[in-house]
Amino acid sequence: MPSFDIVSEVDKQEIRNAVDQLNKEVSARFDFKGSDARAEQTDYELYLFADDEFKLGQVMDILIAKFTKREIDVRCLDKGQVEKISGNKVKQKITVKTGVESDLARKIVKLIKDSKLKVQASIQGEVVRVTGAKRDVLQEVIQLVKGGITELPLQFRNFRD
């Protein structure tokens, strides 16, 4: 029986490259001269630092541009609250969402079941596995999920015949 997995993954090395490019650009830009604006990464968490909220917004815009240039979908970014740290400086935590969360996985399974296609969808941790009798039906499911789910970037992996 043919099957495939629906996942949401982000390449950690591409995130690191985007953050490095952001830090290079911020250090070279004239409007950030003398500023302590920067970005730091720990696994799938990013921390943006700046002198004030306006500059933090500019750093965020640069981050989005660098992610887009490296073909990382910005829908996977979960922005936290802006926190004040020593003096006027501000910090913002950004989490990069990976894996299909259980609520979204249930929504995907419900979408597939409501379509009345002859496939079985099951949730396996942070992956949704779809199994069907024919490849054509599985390709219809891929198109259905691509059109119906827009909250998170999804990839279709592990296609087996």
From Swiss-Prot:
Keyword Nucleotide-binding annotated: yes
SUPFAM superfamilies tied to this protein: YajQ-like (SSF89963)
Single GO cellular component term: cytosol
Keyword terms of this UniProt record: Nucleotide-binding
Stored InterPro entries: DUF520, UPF0234-like_C, UPF0234_N, YajQ-like_sf
Gene Ontology MF terms in the entry: nucleotide binding
Domain of life: Bacteria
Family: Belongs to the YajQ family.
PANTHER family the record matches: UPF0234 PROTEIN YAJQ
NCBIfam families in alphabetical order: PRK05412.1
Function, as annotated: Nucleotide-binding protein.
Protein name: Nucleotide-binding protein Neut_0623
Organism: Nitrosomonas eutropha (strain DSM 101675 / C91 / Nm57)
